[in-house]
């Protein structure tokens, strides 16, 4: 084995890497333990879908709970492997199942990152693993959620490491599993293309200035295999187009004002204040950029591929869709590890003799403190607000009845607590808009308080008996509905009201 982390000619102690990974997992999981309720509305959906799979099997042709969504007509699970991994504890109480799902994702991501560092023989890899704890609040919030995006990040890091070391067989297997774990797994293909093309710019020697076909073929072949063994083939290919192209396009172009008004924060850019709070995540990419610009000999296939990819995701996450930021931050950390590897291999003088370890340790500690103090200062994302409302409807709603959710995201907790009911759309409002743009416009008209008779519209056009309203978010709609004949508020707490419009 070639020289690895620690010093040239010496393999770093594995236990340091394992201990660093365990420390980071404990750090993140300890934060979730302090706030064990769901941190994201999507957690209700994923845990509910896994529980449903235990009864109906892995293949579902229709998501019958949301008749106004395109998934009602054609359903494909975008993350079947993720949901299979949730099956063993899907029937446990929500809080317990959510904690176990979060822990599983944290172990995978941290383990994948540590494995990637080991694969590429990064110097002192435990430092980079510890730095995962200080990448800012956006990345930390993602780590605290039982959602498949955590697995997207872990698989992406593994793909990058296997490309760097040209382990084609392992890359094929990882890409196939990646395709089953997340609908966005196709990003392995452009990553492989970039790796092939980066040799034209790299300073790896004349023999490396070529464009090999193996990485692209292997990545594409592995991804395609995953799609072909998908339980929902061929509908998964339709889902692939909608998830990766239609939804991001609609989110970034504001082509429809009604749809744009309902998009979640993850599909919008972060504000300047929030972006500035992520300063720990910018340390690694800034160092990578400085090193590659000032030291041409450090521009290898590895550093260019991972460095440029991380910068692209960070830029997109900062300016367009914040979800990309969470992927760019750990990739930038891996890019910094690769730059450090090149630095060691070329025996370049230390940039800060005698100060490197102290500065690295200080930056890691400050990043961790800033990240977790920031989480406490902002408070956790309040995804537990609909618990009482959804549980009440689970007890009082009759099978086949329909719920009009003022906030479309409430379909997810209703799916978990009241699976006998139907609602509007789960996960993304674009699925509602694509099925019936006019009806979607009517929905937006109702919840914005512009419809003069919302009760009639809800009864006649949506066929719903129940209406769920967060009163602080929709005061005008609530005021109009309160004056509707026959409307009764049967449940209320500080977060939600449930209004009964009467049986049809």
Where are these regions (language model features)?
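Transmembrane catalytic cores of multi-pass membrane glycosyltransferases
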Residues: 38-42, 54-57, 183-296
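Short hydrophobic/aromatic helix or loop-helix immediately within or flanking a transmembrane segment
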Residues: 68-96
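Transmembrane-helix motifs of polytopic, lipid-linked glycan transferases
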Residues: 100-122
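Short hydrophobic alpha-helices at membrane interfaces in multi-pass membrane enzymes
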Residues: 130, 162-178, 209-218, 304-311
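Membrane-interface alpha helices of multi-pass inner-membrane proteins
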Residues: 136-140, 157-162, 169-184, 188-192, ...
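Membrane-interface transmembrane helices that cradle and orient dolichyl/undecaprenyl
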Residues: 156-170, 203, 288-298
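Signature aromatic-anchored transmembrane alpha helix within multi-pass, membrane-resident enzymes
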Residues: 219-224, 334, 338-373
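Short periplasmic/luminal acceptor-recognition loop of GT-C membrane glycosyltransferases, typified by
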Residues: 397-437, 460, 464-474, 499
